[in-house]
Regions:
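Conserved small/polar residues in nucleotide/adenosyl-binding loops
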Residues: 256-265
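Short, electropositive alpha-helical surface patch
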Residues: 21-28, 119, 238-251
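Substrate-binding cleft/loops of secretory-pathway carbohydrate-active enzymes
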Residues: 108-141
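Glycoside hydrolase catalytic-domain groove-lining segments
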Residues: 76, 87, 139-239, 250-254
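A structural motif corresponding to the C-terminal end of an alpha-helix
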Residues: 1-3, 41-46, 89-104, 137-143, ...
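A general structural detector for well-ordered alpha-helical segments in enzyme core domains, enriched
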Residues: 34, 38, 86-89, 93, ...
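Flexible loop residues that form catalytic
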Residues: 54, 111, 149-150, 266
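Substrate-binding cleft and catalytic face of glycoside hydrolase catalytic domains
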Residues: 1-93, 102-116
């Protein structure tokens, strides 16, 4: 068993929360100090370090979407500030970890879903970038990528969404307040699912092949990095369904590592 240390998994200390949480301009320094303190105590035999778990998720649900994670602000400007501080914290921590352990391999674990093909969907492009791609940009200097995927993101086939989203995204003063509500109404994971769509107990569309989609995606972007599947699974109380899901995921992993071309789908 190879241990992997995770320094941050959603929980923010109350003292930092009371000082503005990730909106605090010193939050990245505070996080780096915390990492340095732990590195002084951790044995050198530990090699793998994950600085932040799913940075896009806790930034999005805490600062852009409504009423999911604390502080539940739902303001685009603050979401961008928090995201920048989170990415800065990761980059500083990466350097600090390597100063204490020259053999360290450092990365982040990213929540990456399969995205429904719809290149004309402006909201899809906006969310995919701010939830996933910009945090992948912050991983350019990382040693490994942690992949955490569960489902596909779909969108309602709404004419209103097509018409008004581009307009909304160009109205700077209004959008920072209205955009979170629009996202909440139109862009949930359930998107365009029908009553016949197979789902898990979490309400996610049953999508074990989403792993293969993201393995290809990551390999295309980071061909020389280690890629670990650090989270995956299904919420179910049916063991047969669980076995089916896990078996399909493993088959997709074998397909990914086979000699056949890996990037044709992306």
């Amino acid at each position: 068993i190879t241990p992997v240390i995770t320094f941050h998994h959603f929980t923010t200390p109350e003292w930092l929360y009371n000082q503005g949480s990730w909106l605090n301009p010193k939050s990245d320094e505070y996080f780096n100090n915390y990492v340095a303190k732990l590195m002084k105590e951790l044995p050198k035999e530990i090699v793998y370090f994950n600085t932040i778990n799913e940075p896009g998720i806790f930034a999005y649900f805490g600062y852009l979407s409504t009423n999911k994670f604390p502080p539940g602000i739902a303001n685009e400007t603050k979401f961008i500030i928090a995201s920048e501080n989170i990415m800065s914290a990761h980059k500083k921590a990466l350097k600090t970890i390597k100063e204490y352990n020259s053999n360290a391999k450092v990365g982040m674990t990213h929540a990456l879903q399969e995205w429904e093909d719809d290149d004309d969907n402006k909201l899809k492009k906006y969310l995919k970038y701010h939830l996933e791609d910009k945090f992948l940009e912050a991983s350019e200097d990382d040693d490994f990528i942690g992949l955490q995927t569960y489902t596909i993101v779909r969108y309602p086939k709404s004419i209103l969404l097509k018409l008004f989203t581009p307009l909304l995204l160009n109205i700077g003063v209004i959008r920072k307040f209205i955009l979170p509500r629009i996202i909440q109404i139109f862009a949930g994971r359930n998107g365009a699912m029908t009553k016949d769509t197979r789902t898990t107990k979490m309400g996610y569309e049953y999508r074990p092949d989403a792993v293969l989609y993201n393995l290809k995606r990551l390999n295309k972007r980071f061909p020389n990095k280690e890629i670990f599947i650090t989270e995956n699974g299904i919420a179910t109380d049916n063991d047969d369904e669980r076995i089916e899901f896990v078996t399909t995921v493993l088959k997709n992993c074998l397909l990914y590592t086979s000699p056949s071309p890996r990037d044709e789908a992306l």
